[in-house]
Swiss-Prot record:
Catalyzes the specific attachment of an amino acid to its cognate tRNA in a 2 step reaction: the amino acid (AA) is first activated by ATP to form AA-AMP and then transferred to the acceptor end of the tRNA. Involved in the perception of beta-aminobutyric acid (BABA) and required for BABA priming effect in disease resistance. Mg(2+) 3 binds at E481. The keyword Ligase applies. Gene3D superfamilies: Bira Bifunctional Protein, Domain 2 (3.30.930.10), Nucleic acid-binding proteins (2.40.50.140). Residues 1-57 are annotated as: Disordered. It is an enzyme of class 6 (ligase). GO terms for molecular function: aspartate-tRNA ligase activity; ATP binding; DNA binding; metal ion binding. InterPro entries: Aa-tRNA-synt_II, aa-tRNA-synth_II, aa-tRNA-synth_II/BPL/LPL, Asp-tRNA_synthase_2, Asp/Asn-tRNA-synth_IIb, NA-bd_OB-fold, NA-bd_OB_tRNA. Residues 110-195 bind DNA. GO terms for biological process: aspartyl-tRNA aminoacylation; defense response to fungus. This is Aspartate--tRNA ligase 2, cytoplasmic. The lineage of its organism: Eukaryota, Viridiplantae, Streptophyta, Embryophyta, Tracheophyta. It comes from Arabidopsis thaliana (Mouse-ear cress).
Amino acid sequence: MSSESEIPPLSSSTAAAEESGEKTSKKAAKKEAAKLEKLRRRQEQEEATRRTASISLEENDEFSNNYGDVTLTELQSSADPKAGKWIEAVEGKEWTDVSDLVEEMLESEVLIRGRVHTNRPTSNKLGFVVLRESGSTVQCVVSQSEKTKVGANMVKYLKQLSRESFVDVIGVVTLPKEPLTGTTQQVEIQVRKVYCINKSLAKLPLSVEDAARSEADIEASLQTPSPAARVNQDTRLNYRVLDLRTPANQAIFQLQYEVEYAFREKLRFKNFVGIHTPKLMAGSSEGGSAVFRLEYKGQPACLAQSPQLHKQMAICGDLRRVFEVGPVFRAEDSFTHRHLCEFVGLDVEMEIRKHYSEIMDLVDELFVFIFTSLNERCKKELQAVGKQYPFEPLKFLPKTLRLTFEEGVQMLKEAGVEVDPLGDLNTESERKLGQLVLEKYNTEFYILHRYPKAVRPFYTMTCADNPLYSNSFDVFIRGEEIISGAQRVHIPEVLEQRAGECGIDVKTISTYIDSFRYGAPLHGGFGVGLERVVMLFCALNNIRKTSLFPRDPQRLSP
């Protein structure tokens, strides 16, 4: 999803299907809300019973200071070290991340915090709890012992802790008798004290353990007496807070951050300046109907489809090289695996010295750097994603392949695929061309340039040697378009003419066009969707997996 691309409207039949799907979705949402309300009432009753039981445990236990629910006073960050047993227990101690628990810490006392991932009591005197912090897990053992001041009531208390409850554990690092297969850490914690910061509902709308299973594991379980649950996409997104806790999702958003970080890092090194453009506009930045319209103090306005116009105006303001990481809004009805109505755009604009190939040079250097950074810096995260969603590493060349649009059309023609030489490539043609490029050049990342002018935005510069083509390009990963870029028209009269041809009211972009009347440099740039970069790098099947809280034609919450 590049922040410069335009998406064709759906057919009437598709729109009708989506309207029907939306009605079904609303009914399902009401049903889901009713179920959740019923669940909430039941949980309130269970909570009252649990608290009563917890109090009775502590009243008859000489070691009651070593466990229990943290009080509200303590949670309000009381400065009094005697405000409660939890504050007294953790006073002066430093928390250790679960991921840092290693054999070198044997016999050390540690304070850790995490969620109850699994809770497995084996007797009234012994229990095992796996604690999870982000994607890291460690086994905690609670064993009744006078010597360690762990009583039977403490074991019972741990039995009551529901999955996903948030707890602090103080204990000693030891080695298990046998290597552990169900945790990321190969040490275990002998529990001395445990305090619950916040309890989770006993019955959750989805299990994090279920949500973390790979499709292969689910299929294999179907052949057993206890088949695993498959958590569908709508359920995941309805309860996104729970879904985000899986190791794969934790890794996906670490990878997303790394893409953004590497993007900023390289561009800063290349003397680019980060900018922030307005998202409220008087007109439409791209033209067409895919705009979120609203009223702005009595004036018609819209949400920006891209920072296109303002990043060009920044160049006219002599900032020379700029980039932006920010939200992009598209009121499209495309309910596909790769389109969102709101996404994060990575946009670049720069002066051109001589030829628009300078922009493609930057794309080449920038994205080879990003891909290399992901492979070198994020091995653990890529492994976590691959465990649930297996994929082959992206194939890319040190020097990115460039083909002209005409060369791409010819490759398709030779493969028996007929396309309009002056039209755009549809999804099937893009995938086929990606397959052909992989077979011939052994790369899944390439640039296709000199697109027909008719399929590009109004501000795209025409080719010098053929007015039917433009100084523009798209970039592809695994057969899907990911970046759109071009040299821009910097001559105001030509801009006015092209805007009119594209159905844009020139008055709504008059300040944009006027900025070129004061002397404007040759310039160009590109835009790419952050979510789509991560989706295609990891070969994921849906962009909603790489959007924290996705917005599509049918989803406005959570």
